[in-house]
Amino acid sequence: MHLSGIPYEAAEILTDKAKMKDAFRQGGVSAADGMRVRSAEEAQKAAEQLGYPVVVKRVDSSGSRGITVVEHSGQIEEAYENARNGSARDYVLVEKFLRGTEIGVDGFVQNHKLVFLAPHTKFVYRGAHTTVPVGHAFPYGCSGALREEIARQMQLAVTASGADQCSVNADVFVDGEKVW
């Protein structure tokens, strides 16, 4: 039918946080260090290697479902089980916890190029095991240099994932002029 839209391969990458992390690492996108694990024991080893605090993530959910910030080893098993429950995958992601401010970035991609970018402040409600966005504020107030770095990182992510002919929505951490 030759309809335009996101390529299947890009959708596969962008709907699995571990595959996305692999693609981003290969594409030079700034991201938290992390490891794919298949057991609570592997999660424990990954957390020790990365250093606490870490984030244990379900790889195939959105809305922060299946995501737990882990401060010490006594929390790993429960965090691993929380991430595995409800997942179609046999692995989860353990990442180094990033400090900074979480913002949202929306945009449009045409011919593999980010043609519109709208970084914004996010307002969220945080429950026990989920985060729900309740509002956004546009434009995001930042320096020109930071806006350029956000755009650069987003273009790297678009290129690394193969996203094309689509809208994009990303959660980005900002600390000073650093973007993840």
Spell out what each predicted region is:
Residues 1, 10-14:
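N-terminal glycine-rich "phosphate-gripper" loop used for MgATP/nucleotide binding
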Residues 2-6, 57-59:
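Short beta-strands and strand-loop turn motifs
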Residues 83-91, 98-140, 148-180:
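Phosphate-binding core of ATP-grasp and ATP-grasp-like enzymes
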Residues 13-93, 99, 110-111, 140-152, ...:
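Active-site nucleotide/adenylate-binding loops and adjacent lid/helix of ATP-dependent enzymes
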Residues 6-9, 30-32, 62-65, 93, ...:
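Residue-level signal for pocket-adjacent positions within structured domains
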Residues 1, 68, 107:
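Short amphipathic alpha-helical segments
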Residues 1-2, 22-23, 132-135:
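A short alpha-helix capping/helix-coil boundary motif
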